[in-house]
């Protein structure tokens, strides 16, 4: 993401102009937008024209519109973002008050104005515009006949390919059909890696499986690379890291990212920090349950007692349509930071964020136990 201009007043009203440069930037943009914001961008509008003879025709024109945002639609797989609202500035093609849908596109600037820019949104802009926050992890989670090729970015887990094929069982004295099907499967996975992994960006490729599937696949992969002179694979052989997983399904990526060998390799990435924080929370919940709580009421009470050491919260909560609810979570984050705590904001499109959402989307590791908090947990109504 490229920041072109930032004009925010002391009362936190103002506007920013940004250019999304890659697919993940569309996800960041989705998280910046809220109903009631003002969005200005270049867009296509179908307009009717009347010729001198009186015949009416229509054509598509590119124009710049400013709309008041009413609905926001994001396709996470295609990374497409469509924003619908009413036109609030005079335009030669579109009447004031007319509805229009702007499709935001990579490499095309937009200006976003808000009456109130909160700390969460401003921090997201800062991170999105920081080159250090880039996608640098790929993962192949596999078992015989099933593989998922994913890109793990700081903000999301993107499924790039799912390969599924039937592998006949081994038969006593005749393994030919099994071996042929397995080789064909490995070939499909190899082609998926070549098609979907950009080795100029990716620093590590995790190959995970139960049993010996990962070893057998990597042996096949690099023998085939030598045979076919696939230099892209041979030159990046050192980036491949084999790890255990319980299955070849996408959800197994969570356990893969918790593997000590993986966390050591990915120690500087935001994704690794989130995985570690969630792992620490589960350990605390198991061994010292009076220092690990989830749910907004419990966490707020712990924060009032200055007990929150680490706050875990999903970005989905900051997209809440109800402004007071959204503000409540922003205040919690700001307060924890002011009290010296650490805040980890999880992406709801990341496997760790999906898990945290199952725990209400907000959790905390405490510095010390808080009296009466455990008693309230069982009777608390979550908002």
Curated annotation (Swiss-Prot):
Purpose: Component of the Pelota-HBS1L complex, a complex that recognizes stalled ribosomes and triggers the No-Go Decay (NGD) pathway. In the Pelota-HBS1L complex, PELO recognizes ribosomes stalled at the 3' end of an mRNA and engages stalled ribosomes by destabilizing mRNA in the mRNA channel. Following mRNA extraction from stalled ribosomes by the SKI complex, the Pelota-HBS1L complex promotes recruitment of ABCE1, which drives the disassembly of stalled ribosomes, followed by degradation of damaged mRNAs as part of the NGD pathway.
Subcellular location: Cytoplasm
Keywords: Cell cycle, Cell division, Cytoplasm, Metal-binding
GO molecular function terms attached to this record: metal ion binding; ribosome binding
Keyword Thylakoid: no
GO CC annotation terms, alphabetical: cytoplasm; Dom34-Hbs1 complex
Protein name per UniProt: Protein pelota homolog
Quaternary structure (record): Component of the Pelota-HBS1L complex, also named Dom34-Hbs1 complex, composed of PELO and HBS1L.
Gene3D superfamilies: 3.30.1330.30, eRF1 domain 2 (3.30.420.60), Pelota, domain A (2.30.30.870)
GO biological process entries: cell division; nonfunctional rRNA decay; nuclear-transcribed mRNA catabolic process, no-go decay; nuclear-transcribed mRNA catabolic process, non-stop decay; rescue of stalled ribosome; ribosome disassembly; RNA surveillance
Record-stated family: Belongs to the eukaryotic release factor 1 family. Pelota subfamily.
NCBIfam families, per the entry: pelota
Named cofactor requirement(s): a divalent metal cation
